[in-house]
């Protein structure tokens, strides 16, 4: 399997050191948080986007995905007003454009605060979501990217698409070629889900895979059963791209925690790449 890691784990002023670490591990892919490089996406020029892409590319590293799309955009809510939905679609249109130029085809939609269905019944929730994500799917299709809906457990305060099964149900009903789901090992652990059951039923819906722990601690520091995740992926989605997702550590240098996480990822998911 091919390993990637999200830059949610480090600060962009550490990019050169991270580049060296990734080269040491023979890792040639990263996911990014777009806001780290482009704090105002609507004002970002194509040249600025190409500059980021080219820097990583010349170092042998491909940007393959994006996450945390709506960080600090709490005024936007799928289940808010029509104006709120319209604002969100316009903003995400720009995010998809950035993804297209970067080559980051896998756009992960997590954003639990931006999918708050409070006050709506199941039917209302479903109808609004299907309509919204079909519109977003059309935007993604125009930009040659895929939106991957992320399960977010109730444990994190989310109240829509909490489980992998709920997410798969929504993706199935949306029925748009540019809307997939994300497989998330941390969510599987929190929800005590059976990854073999998920993949036996829904492997065709998976657009991206995050390797994570509950609370996004460094890989291996939580209780996710990564051997089980690997075995299921090897059976149903061999040769997958799998991306390490962990928060930047507060009590340990980022390079130290990232090195530990990559050792775990490579040992289980890609032993041939160990330095």
Task: List the predicted regions and their residue ranges.
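Histidine-acidic metal/acid-base catalytic patches
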Residues: 1-4, 11-26, 57, 89, ...
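Short phosphate-binding/catalytic loops that engage adenosine nucleotides
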Residues: 27, 61, 145
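Glycine-rich, aromatic-flanked loop segments that form ligand/cofactor-binding clefts
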Residues: 56-64
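Short, solvent-exposed loop/turn segments at secondary-structure boundaries
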Residues: 41-45, 77-83, 119-124, 158-162, ...
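Active-site acidic/histidine proton-transfer and metal-coordination neighborhood
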Residues: 16, 58, 75-180, 190
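Active-site-proximal loop/turn and secondary-structure-junction residues that shape catalytic pockets
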Residues: 9-11, 34-36, 69-72, 113-115, ...
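Glycine-rich, proline-tolerant flexible connector loops at the mouths of alpha/beta enzymes
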Residues: 33-53, 113, 117
């Amino acid at each position: 399997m091919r390993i990637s890691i999200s830059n949610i784990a480090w600060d962009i002023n550490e990019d050169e050191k991270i580049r060296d670490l990734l080269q040491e591990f023979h890792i040639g892919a990263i996911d990014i948080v777009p806001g780290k490089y482009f704090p105002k996406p609507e004002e970002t020029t194509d040249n600025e986007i190409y500059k980021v892409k080219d820097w990583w590319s010349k170092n042998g590293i491909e940007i393959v995905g994006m996450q945390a799309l709506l960080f600090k955009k709490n005024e936007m809510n799928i289940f808010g007003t029509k104006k709120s939905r319209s604002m969100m679609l316009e903003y995400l249109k720009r995010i998809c454009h950035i993804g297209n130029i970067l080559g980051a085809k896998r756009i992960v939609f997590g954003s639990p605060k931006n999918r708050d269905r409070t006050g709506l019944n199941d039917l209302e929730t479903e109808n609004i979501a299907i309509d919204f994500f079909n519109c977003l799917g059309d935007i993604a299709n125009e930009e040659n990217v895929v939106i991957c809906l992320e399960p977010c457990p109730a444990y994190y305060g989310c109240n829509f698409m909490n489980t992998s099964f709920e997410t798969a149900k929504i993706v199935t009903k949306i029925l748009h070629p540019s809307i997939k789901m994300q497989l998330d090992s941390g969510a599987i652990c929190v929800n005590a889900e059976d990854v073999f059951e998920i993949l036996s039923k829904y492997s065709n819906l998976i657009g991206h895979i995050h390797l994570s722990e509950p609370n996004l601690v460094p890989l291996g520091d939580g209780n996710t059963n990564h051997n089980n995740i690997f075995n299921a992926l090897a059976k149903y989605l061999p040769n997958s791209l799998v991306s390490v997702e962990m928060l930047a550590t507060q009590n340990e240098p980022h390079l130290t925690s990232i090195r530990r996480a990559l050792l775990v990822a490579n040992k289980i998911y890609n032993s041939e790449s160990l330095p």
